[in-house]
Amino acid sequence: MAANEKTFGGAISEARKAKGWALKDLASRVLREDKEAISLQYLNDIEHDRRSPSSDRMVQQFADVLGIDRDWLYYLAGRFPEDVRDKKLSEKQVAEAMVAFRGGPRKGKGRS
């Protein structure tokens, strides 16, 4: 990955710092499935790209709390949002969507 490419953790860290928050300030606002705040170590691991968010709900919380576009965070996390996954697309529809996302047709028809 090039040095100028943003990662999920990098985006979270940058947004947190822009708000002037310490790790504990953000960690207290993002809840696990059991409704407890995430740990400082877990957040630190996420910010340093050693761990990924454990659920869609957590990606959404980071987006909402930090004011980051949800789709951008899903992209950085390497995930598709639930509403996209629920579409039950065919192989052809997915291929066409990926071509559009990439900005044009791929060379050759094989998988890359």
Give residue ranges: language-model regions:
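Key DNA-contacting residues within the recognition helix of helix-turn-helix
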Residues: S13, A27, S39-L40, N44, ...
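Residues within the alpha-helical elements of helix-turn-helix
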Residues: A18, R29, V65
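A short, Lys/Arg-rich alpha-helix, primarily the initiator
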Residues: M1-W21, D25, D71
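Recognition helix of helix-turn-helix/homeodomain-like DNA-binding domains
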Residues: L31-P53, G78
